[in-house]
Amino acid sequence: MAMPRKSVAIIAAMPRELAPLLRGVPGQLADSVEFFELENAVVAVGGIGRIAAWSAAEAAVKRYQPSTLISAGIAGALTASLKVGDVVRGSEVVDADSGARFTASGGESVMVTVSSVSGPEDKRLLADRYKADVVDMECAVVGAVAREHGIAFLAVKAISDEFDFEMPPMAGFVNGNGKFETARFAAYIAVRPKWWSTLRQLAANSRKASMNLSHALEHLIYEYANTTQEEKIPRA
């Protein structure tokens, strides 16, 4: 069902990635996607990974007819110069699985989308192969949807894990619907104390990244909600 048109649709994996932006905004579940309607934008939260991102982006386009799609969330750094909380805008997004490349508006960095969380060694390989600055798990899919529908595409990420950060083994706890199985992961971690301090640090990093990302998105929503379609070129 079509809803009142929103010129900006933001696609995210989890609500907590944009917690400050969404504070006090009720979510509406439709087609397995949770929608948060802001004054000049809608946030579509579909889950982690490619399939979830595709579902959220397609549902947002169908329901709200946006002229701009923004892939937003927390991500990993592929260069030592990027620090926790830094907000990065992409100029190009590479799909590591297919090799497809998508142009994003207003950015200066290369981002690469992968299918699983990357540790330091994987990050080094990705940086060397793609000359990329940032790694995530959804961005390229949003770029593909934007290209298919002929609308503007932005990639905006905030760093939660730096280049040399050793991520906990979280990939195996994402179910087929892109949802993170928190209870099962907690049971796994409870008997593995070597990861406790890492998780505390990651939680603090993610809160900082979420705050900075939300502030950046507030400015972008205002900018793109008051910009004509012609001014949004280049498109995906």
Regions picked out by a protein language model, each given a short descriptive name:
Residues 14-15, 139:
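Helix N-cap/beta->alpha junction signal
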Residues 17-21, 52:
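Short N-terminal binding/cap micro-motifs at the start of the first secondary-structure element
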Residues 11-13, 44:
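Short hydrophobic segments within beta-strands
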Residues 31-236:
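Glycine-rich phosphate- or other oxyanion-binding loops that anchor nucleotides, phosphorylated ligands
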